[in-house]
Amino acid sequence: MMVIPAVDIKGGKCVRLLQGDMNAETVFSDDPGAMAERWAEAGAELIHVVDLDGAIEKSPRNLKAISALIRRVGVPVQVGGGIREIDTVKMYADLGVARIVIGSAAVNHPDLVTAACREFPGRIVLGIDARDGRVATEGWTSTTDIAAADLAARFEGCGVAAINFTDIHRDGMRTGPNIPAIEAFARATAIPVVASGGVSTIDDIQALLGIQEFGVTGVITGRALYDGTLDLAEAIAVASAGDSTSQKSVG
């Protein structure tokens, strides 16, 4: 299971939010690239970057910071937030982004996901953010009537590399991941699942390893790393030691 550190960017700075609230931010660094480099040096094999302003404004807003981050780190980077058009997908691919995360557009413009998977095989990740099991969109400001598992089912077989599944109620709260919800979601799809939301300790990593067999192939963690309740190098070591054979693969 891969442990993936998150670098959320707002106004060019590295921040963390509580439950996606843009008004409840904590600034951890004026230099997102430096934070990403720190996580890479700790052993991260992939950095998860979110353009928070882009998610709200529906188009990239932190390209300068993201470009600098990509140039600085020597590991693959995946980017999400504000990706609504195929031209944006192409731009990020040309920029050197290893994986491009499509979230809200998967609900409103599903053809974008299909086209992106066709043009960039193995590089498209579906971002599904759930509030009480229902898909949230537009930077989590709107909740639909679509069940998270139903949205995932729409893209079975189109070549999506993975699904980033976020439990909004747990995001940034350090209350532990919602294991039953993650397991149920992973069981419902053949696509590899990367869990996000609530991870704060090594025990949480162990808990996720317990459902790895159902296709949970990675975990994204942010605030716990910045607050120091989770050591990235230790988490990576524990996750690697707990790896078991699975039919799904994040890679």
From Swiss-Prot:
Record localization: Cytoplasm
Cited HAMAP family: HisA
GO MF annotation list: 1-(5-phosphoribosyl)-5-[(5-phosphoribosylamino)methylideneamino]imidazole-4-carboxamide isomerase activity
Keyword Translocase included in the entry's annotation: no
Keywords: Amino-acid biosynthesis, Cytoplasm, Histidine biosynthesis, Isomerase
Pathway: Amino-acid biosynthesis; L-histidine biosynthesis; L-histidine from 5-phospho-alpha-D-ribose 1-diphosphate: step 4/9
NCBIfam families, per the entry: 1-(5-phosphoribosyl)-5-[(5-phosphoribosylamino)methylideneamino]imidazole-4-carboxamide isomerase (TIGR00007), PRK13585.1 (NF010112)
Disulfide bonds: none
InterPro entries listed in its UniProt record: Aldolase_TIM, His_biosynth, HisA_bact_arch, Isoase_HisA-like, Isoase_HisA-like_bact, RibuloseP-bd_barrel
Classification via PANTHER family: 1-(5-PHOSPHORIBOSYL)-5-[(5-PHOSPHORIBOSYLAMINO)METHYLIDENEAMINO] IMIDAZOLE-4-CARBOXAMIDE ISOMERASE (PTHR43090:SF2)
Active site positions: 8, 129
Protein name: 1-(5-phosphoribosyl)-5-[(5-phosphoribosylamino)methylideneamino] imidazole-4-carboxamide isomerase
Reactions this protein catalyses: 1-(5-phospho-beta-D-ribosyl)-5-[(5-phospho-beta-D-ribosylamino)methylideneamino]imidazole-4-carboxamide = 5-[(5-phospho-1-deoxy-D-ribulos-1-ylimino)methylamino]-1-(5-phospho-beta-D-ribosyl)imidazole-4-carboxamide
GO biological process: L-histidine biosynthetic process; L-tryptophan biosynthetic process
Family, per entry: Belongs to the HisA/HisF family.
EC number annotated for this UniProt entry: 5.3.1.16
GO cellular-component term (any): cytoplasm
